[in-house]
Amino acid sequence: MYNFVMRLLELKLTNYRNCRDLSLNLNSGKILIIGKNAQGKTNILESIYFLSALKSPRTSNNIEIINFNAETAEIEAELVKANTSVTLDYSYSKEKNRILKVNGVKTTPKNFKQVLKTVLFSTNDLLLLRGNPSDRRDWLDRAISQVYPAYDERLSKYDKIRIQKNNFLKELIKGA
């Protein structure tokens, strides 16, 4: 059985985009993020999603999360899940070295992504209502993968097989 109750208590960003050194205590319950444009509000939300998905919703190039004047970006979080304290630590360097730790112990991306569950809803997700069926499927696939990590693996295998099948059919048509 899955336990979905968790609370993010602390978030620390070091050289994450424009957040050079930011520590947030999120233990007060209700959080309101207020600031002028380009002050890092979206970066805070993105970093939380990044910890759960190990990718940014805004870029496919992880080097872009590193502050221009730094060599490494780091995201640290403390959360409580099923009455157990858990720490997450993600660091990424311009040399593309990635370190993932859960409770101070290095771990795999698969195990890391199983700790924090988030579902991102952004203005781009308005495509759920007006966009293509493929946009709806992509959003739903991301949401299901958060709840059932094995789904992500199966989906990747399915996509590879589908691409192979399509390539095979194209070759078959060319040969006919």
Put a short name on every predicted segment.
Residues 45, 49, 66, 140-141, ...:
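Conserved protein kinase catalytic domain
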Residues 53-129, 133-135, 139, 144-147, ...:
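Nucleotide-state sensing region of NTPase/ATPase domains
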Residues 147-168:
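Amphipathic alpha-helical coiled-coil segments
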Residues 169-176:
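Secondary-structure edge/capping motif, primarily at the C-terminal ends of alpha-helices
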Residues 15-16, 36-38, 110-112, 136, ...:
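Short, flexible segments with low predicted structural confidence
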Residues 28, 39, 43, 60, ...:
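Generic alpha-helix structural propensity
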Residues 2-50:
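Pre-Walker A-like glycine/lysine-rich segment at the N-terminus of P-loop NTPase domains
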Residues 1-2, 84, 174:
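N-terminal leader/targeting segments
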